[in-house]
UniProtKB/Swiss-Prot annotation:
This is Porphobilinogen deaminase. GO terms for biological process: chlorophyll biosynthetic process; protoporphyrinogen IX biosynthetic process. Keywords: Chlorophyll biosynthesis, Porphyrin biosynthesis, Transferase. Binds 1 dipyrromethane group covalently. It comes from Chlorobium luteolum (strain DSM 273 / BCRC 81028 / 2530) (Pelodictyon luteolum). Monomer. It comes from the Bacteria. GO terms for molecular function: hydroxymethylbilane synthase activity. It is an enzyme of class 2 (transferase).
Amino acid sequence: MKKQLIIGTRSSPLALWQAEFTKAELSRHFPDLEITLKLVKTTGDVLLDSPLSKIGDMGLFTKDIEKFLIAKEIDLAVHSLKDVPTATPEGLIISAFTEREDTRDVIISKTGAKLLDLPKNAKVATSSLRRMSQLKSLRPDFEICDIRGNLNTRFKKFDEGEFDAMMLAYAGVYRLNFSDRISEILPHEIMLPAVGQGALGIETRVDDEQTREIVKVMNHSTTEYCCKAERALLRHLQGGCQIPIGAYASFKNGTLHLLAFVGSTDGTIGIRDEITKTGLTSPSQAEEAGIELAKELLKQGAEKILSEIRKSC
């Protein structure tokens, strides 16, 4: 058994929370293990002037950390799973999916108003095409404004800016103790989350069997089934672009239920569908369900939506 572990992480407050959480959990199970953090500045932390959709790189918040992992300068990387591309670099693997926090998105508004009660032509801040698409389908009058930076920076920009509301993931807001700022938690019926939202992905080298065995203690089986279904769906739909896709899977007693959404960036077209599979006994079966739903979405018109978006990539 290893005596030391180095965790690679971004340096944002939320990333540090995630890394410290991982460190604490591993220390609880392996009290004699010496665990340290290595902070890595990623491309996504540096390129803050452009919307994420315009940058186009799928590994903005992960690939720089993965370089350290491949070079054996760290033993594992802790990521927000929603930031992790569905294809990991050769030699790397997601070895643990941590128990998921609430997957829903939230609205933070200046007046405390809920989403549908915001004034006409309200300015809503988000950097996500997924949120933009679903917001515009609900309220075509909204003016969507790009907002970048870590969570603390976004709250500062929001408080100082001319926004009426801002949309964020509940998980990050809760973990950094901003829950008192929430105006509304949005149900999945109107806002499907990002693939993997609320879960952490712990990435290791494939050939590092000791570290893989250590981090297994953090793997949450239900989350693994759900996130593998969602990621398989995204992988089958994606073509290397930032695209408006939402998904949410639940898994209980061998039954997987998966909801998914693909929409145009302007919100004028949106396709939602779902699938239920019973008797599942392995995560690979959950992945098959994700691929099956992706194929159904493509048949229903998602291919046309995605091909239009890819033209501008």
